């Protein structure tokens, strides 16, 4: 069951591809230089920061940086490759090698980023874009967005409070 869920998760991780100008074909490895990964895709910055890896790694490899920051290398590689490389299809062995705590840390930090930064920024841009709209229309759109944001908060809170602790117990 766990591998089925992880398999689906990694197959659906295409959310960062819009941040890059082109698709990449060669998967990154533990020996790839982190600076090369960042230069090839700005989306990698979001991923590594959510794994707790700060900037300032010079010419170090992904493996070296993961070791220094206590991040599972195989999990980070799967996150990077699944998010950045077009049509990346991880093997069952790669999916089975995921370190659950590293993945859950990434997901928890992703929730925090989205709830604390992205949703408020989207709301602010939406309000700014509606500055010249009729007040009744602005009210309806703002209310719709706020209700949507609340549903997202509830969903992510449920995952943080219920799903992730349950997954840790498996």
Give the label of every model feature segment:
Residues 2-170:
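Small-residue-biased structural context
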């Amino acid at each position: 069951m766990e591998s089925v869920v992880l398999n689906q998760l990694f197959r659906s991780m295409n959310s960062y591809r819009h941040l890059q100008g082109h698709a990449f074909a060669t998967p990154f490895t533990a020996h790839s230089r982190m600076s090369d990964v960042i230069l090839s895709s700005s989306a990698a910055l979001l991923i590594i920061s959510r794994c707790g890896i700060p900037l300032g790694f010079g010419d170090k490899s992904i493996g070296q940086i993961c070791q220094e920051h206590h991040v599972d290398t195989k999990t980070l590689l799967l996150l990077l490759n699944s998010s950045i490389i077009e049509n990346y299809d991880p093997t069952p062995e790669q999916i089975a090698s995921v370190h659950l705590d590293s993945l859950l840390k990434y997901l928890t930090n992703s929730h925090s980023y989205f709830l604390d930064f992205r949703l408020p920024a989207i709301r602010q841009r939406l309000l700014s874009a509606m500055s010249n709209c009729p007040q009744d229309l602005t009210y309806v759109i703002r209310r719709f967005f706020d209700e949507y944001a609340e549903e997202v908060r509830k969903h992510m809170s449920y995952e943080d409070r219920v799903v992730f602790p349950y997954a840790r117990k498996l």
